[in-house]
Amino acid sequence: MKDINLMSSLVKFGDEHAKVLRGINVYTEINAPRYWWQEMDTYRVGTERLSSESTMHMQGNGLIGDELIAFKENFAEGNMQKRIQMFSYQTLRRIYIQRKNHRLPQWRTFCEWIKTLPYADKLITVGTNDVDA
């Protein structure tokens, strides 16, 4: 517990003091609308996409040429896409701070999930001025 408390105090001083969070990684499967994934692409450091569903092979299976192009051009942004993603705790902290009160409900749901991770209260949400964090 002594190490966790030390890490927690360093996290409060900012990213430059919390380098240890870069080494704590979480792997998860997320099923979200494509418009949400476009916003998630903002976070490129401390995250890695391990796999994702291909619209061409999943929903557009069997289409070729102009039919395939027309399908992809008209593909709704609300369609769900599943991806397996890796995040560092440092990136999850950044996401949490920036998106916990976002107007898209998917971000609030994602931030609620972040709070369920081991030691999230000491390493991710600590010092974020959340009453219930």
Give residue spans per PLM region.
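Family-specific signature for flavin-dependent thymidylate synthase
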Residues: 1-133
